[in-house]
Amino acid sequence: MTVPATRLVRQSLAATSQLLALNNENAAHLSHLTHTQFGRLIGESFYAGVINDADALLLSFDQSADYDSPNFLWFRERYDRFVYVDRVVTAAAARGQGYARTLYADLFVRARAAGHTRVVCEVNFEPPNPVSDAFHAALGFVEVGRGSVHNHSKTVRYLLRNL
């Protein structure tokens, strides 16, 4: 299998609308965003990688980001330095091609190059997301905590991978 090329996304990207649509199609596991919110997240990101125009997206922040997500803040309270994966999503038609794994591999290289020693994220525990659980476990992530979000309507597992 050929490894797909990744590229970085910035706010001026013409495909932002396609990426936003990809995000919002998967809002049950991510969160629904407006165009303005999505553009702000991309602009604030440590790494915003995409494969093709909108086959896969990984959006992450480092510890200094101006971001008020309760999950991001959970990590900020516990670690001085980290890269937080806010969302990773693959289009339904592109699943099974290794795109998310490729984006994570690119993120790990860039995070190490920037002097980071850990990448963190959260995965839904309730409602469960077994595909994401298995994927992150295969990448070497381990659970470091749990928390309730959205007025206790969701429970998440906080995960960490040392680089």
Spans of model-derived segments:
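C-terminal "cap" of GNAT-fold acetyltransferases
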Residues: R146-L163
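Residue-level recognition of the GNAT/N-acetyltransferase active site
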Residues: D86, A91, N124
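Conserved active-site alpha-helix within GNAT-family acetyltransferase domains
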Residues: F125-G145
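Conserved beta-hairpin
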Residues: E44-D62
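Conserved acyl-donor/pantetheine-binding loop and adjacent beta-alpha core of acyl/acetyltransferases
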Residues: L59-R87, N151
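Short amphipathic alpha-helix that is part of the acyltransferase structural core
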Residues: M1-Q37, N52-D55
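Conserved GNAT acetyl-CoA-binding A-motif
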Residues: A111-F125
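Conserved acetyl-CoA-binding loop-helix of GNAT-fold acetyltransferases
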Residues: T90, G96-V109, A138
